[in-house]
Amino acid sequence: MAIKKYIANADNTISNAWQSNLTRRATGSNMGAADVLETYSVYARAYTSSAENKQVELSRILIKFPVDDITSDRSSGIIPASGNVNFYLKLYNAETSKTVPERYTLTVQPVSQSWQEGTGLDLENYLDYTVGNTGSDWVQRTKDDAGAILNWVNAGGDYLTASNYDQLFEGGLENMEVDVTILMEEWIGGVYSNYGFGIALSASQEITASYNLTGAATSYYTKRFFGRGTQYYFKRPAIEARWDSRIKDDRGNTFYSSSLSTASENLNTLYLYNYVRGGLTNIPDVGTGLLKVSVYSGSIDNSAPSGSKMTLVQDDTYVTADSVEYATAGYVSTGIYSCSFAVTASKTPPTRMFDVWYSGSNRYFTGSFKPQTLEASQISLRPTYYINISNLKQSYRSDENARFNLFVREKNWSPTIYTKANGLVETETIESASYRVYRQIDALEAISYG
C-alpha cells in the first residue's frame, strides 16, 4: 500500500455565533490563521425575541487542498490513473477543555465559489474582523484585486449539495476519515472547479430555522480539528492518496506446478528491473511493449543457462498453445517488466533454472531462480516469523524515499550447525505482511495497519 499526503493549503472557520456580550454576532469575524478548526450548533443561547433565526448559532469549516499538485503528480506517474487510487480526507481531533457532543454526523460538501483564507486567530471572542479586508467570514467570501467585496449567495457558504459525504462520530472524539475519491476525480478532471470542502453538522443536527425546518432543537457543541497551521506535524489536515503499489516478485519463492494448487497459484511471477545510472528507465527498443521470457535448465555447475528452452505450462494468457517455449512479459511501470508462468517438474527436477528475457534477436537480461516442490503435510503449519530491518537508520529526511531491507526467519529456527559451518544465513520469503509506523517517544501512530 502506497500513501501520499497532500496537506491543506487554505482553511478557515466561519461562524454566526453570538459574541460573549450576546449583542453582536461573529458573522464578520475571520479565523483563517488559527491552528484549530471548529464546527458546532448551539440552540437558543441568546433567545432575545420571537424571531426564530436569532436562536441559531452555527460554526462551519472551510478547507482547500492543492488539487493542481495531485494532477501534476498523476501526469508524471507518481500516483496512478483514475480507478487505481482512492483519496481520503483526513482531519485529526484537537483536544479541548470544552464539551464534545456524542452521536453526531458531520457532512462534507464541495464549496461552489472561491473564498479567501484570511489572517484571523480568535476562536474564543471572535474579535478578528474581516470588515472589508482580505478573507472570508459568514457573509463575505473574498475581496478581489479591485478591492470589491464579494459575498456568499447564502450566508454561511455556498455548497454543491448533490455531492456530500457523511461520517458518524459515536463518541465525539474521533478523527475524520472520509473517502472523497469521486469528488477528487471530478476536480482533477475539471468537472467542477476546486474551491475546497465545507464541513458542518448534518442538516438534521444543525439548528432548526426558517431555511432548515427539519433541523434540531438541541445543541451540538463543539467539535474541533487541528488546522494546517498546527505545530503537530502528523496532525495537519490532509488528502491521502492510497493505492496498491505491491510488487510480488516470486524469484526467491518459486514452485513447480502441482495438483495441490489451483492454476493461478501455480503461476510464478518474475520481474525485470532496468536501472540506468541509478534510475529506472524503459528499455529503448521495447518501451512499453512486450518481451519474451524463456526458461532453461542450468549447466553442469549451475552457473549459466544450458540446453534447449523448457516447455512451460499452457495457460492461454501468458503461455499459449503456439508459444509453450516462452511466456509473454508485459510493461508494469517505468523500467519494470513482469511475466508469469508455470513449469512442471521432471522426474529429476533441476535445482536451479534460468530465465532469459529477449525480443527478436536481442537478449536483455538473464536471471535465475530455484524452484521448490510443493508437498502436503500431516500437521497444521502456522509459522511465526521474526523480522529485522537490516538497514534501519536513526532518522530520515522528510523528503527521503527510504527502502527497507528485511531479514526474515522463523521463530524456532536454530542457527547451530554441527556438520558444516556456513557464514551465509538465507532469509525466508513471506507472501503477505502488514506494517504500521508510529513515533516511539509517545506512540503516535503516523501510518496504521492496512
Give the residues covered by each predicted segment.
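Short, aromatic- and glycine-rich surface loops/edge beta-strands on solvent-exposed regions
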Residues: 347-367, 435
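Intrinsically disordered, low-complexity transcriptional effector regions of transcription factors
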Residues: 314-316, 321-324, 332-339, 352-356, ...
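Structured core elements
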Residues: 177, 240, 271, 355-357, ...
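Contiguous segments within soluble domain cores/interaction surfaces
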Residues: 291-295, 299, 305-306, 379-381, ...
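Secreted, disulfide-rich extracellular signaling modules
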Residues: 1-348, 361, 377-378
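Short, compositionally biased P/S/T/A/G/V-rich stretches that sit at domain boundaries
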Residues: 243-263, 275-278, 363-418
